[in-house]
Amino acid sequence: MKKLVIATRGSQLALWQSNHIKAILQEQNPGLEVELNVIVTTGDRIQDKALSKIGGKGLFLKELEEAMLQGEAQIAVHSLKDVPTVMPDGLILAAITEREDSRDALLSEKYANIDALPKNAVVGTSSLRRRMQIQKLRPDLIIKDLRGNVDTRIRKLKEGEFDAIILAAAGINRLSLLDAVKHVYPISLEEMVPSMGQGALGIEAVNDAEVLRIVAGLEDEYSRIETTIERSFVDELEGGCQVPIGVNASVLDDGTISIRAVLGLPNGEEMLSDSKITSKKDYENIGREIAAEFIEKGAKELLSRAEAMMENK
């Protein structure tokens, strides 16, 4: 193969990620031409509604997947947290890159951390998972929907529309935005459990042997283990992007895996959570086993109520 086309969204972060992967692929495959095919997705076009109201994060993938299936691209680079657990026929999750910081981060021009926020401070997030957990920590805060790409969200913060906003730490790091806002507070895993796959890039590809050979060098073993656990947990719960679920698996220095999971109602009034240390052995099934424990505690019913809450909002 002489040329590989990457389907990508046109946002600043998406282009950074795709160009980052392009550079690695060209370094690993001398002589390979790599080109970007920039596509505007439904999620990019609809900016005036909450994601949970219009179909969730999958709206950022649909057109990219169609481009691959129609032969207009061979791979797409995604923030793995945005990739549903079920792939369309003909496409596979071919590689998962080394993980950046998996945590969420609180950004503010005035307040250094969550505790410093005054009563009735306005916090912006489009994520039901973040909304649930911040409301559990601080029920006195006002949570408002925040859409747009990273620079749009930061502009809204700087213009005073919000006292603080919550973003993925990885995106801030990738775009070198640590100095763009006065306070950037990485939220600990104890305070807020991230989304499945957060911090890693997922390389979705056509199921073609030559393409898979080219992208194989992007694969990170630990990221695959961690995110397989996280994605299988969400898959077992049948939890799409429109329900509040957080799950994080981290391979520790001694080879064991630390796992945290949380789910509940968007207002934070009812939540199920658990954390445990386990071995890497049989990691493909760990997420499903933990999900089964959550289901025994009433997780499915709680998620159904969460969906109903959002539909009636």
Curated annotation (Swiss-Prot):
Sorted alphabetically, the Gene Ontology cellular component annotations on this record are: cytoplasm
**EC number, as in UniProt:** 2.5.1.61
Cofactor: bound how, per the entry note?
A: Binds 1 dipyrromethane group covalently.
Group of enzyme by EC: transferase
Coiled coil location: none
Which keywords label this protein?
Answer: Porphyrin biosynthesis, Transferase
Residues where S-(dipyrrolylmethanemethyl)cysteine is found: 241
Question: GO terms for molecular function, please?
Answer: hydroxymethylbilane synthase activity
Give the highest taxon in the source lineage: Bacteria
State the similarity comment. Belongs to the HMBS family.
Cite the record's note on assembly: Monomer.
What this protein is reported to do is described as:
Tetrapolymerization of the monopyrrole PBG into the hydroxymethylbilane pre-uroporphyrinogen in several discrete steps.
Recorded hits in PANTHER family, A to Z, give: PORPHOBILINOGEN DEAMINASE
Q: Which NCBIfam families match?
A: hemC
Q: What is this protein called?
A: Porphobilinogen deaminase
Q: Which organism is it from?
A: Sulfurimonas denitrificans (strain ATCC 33889 / DSM 1251)
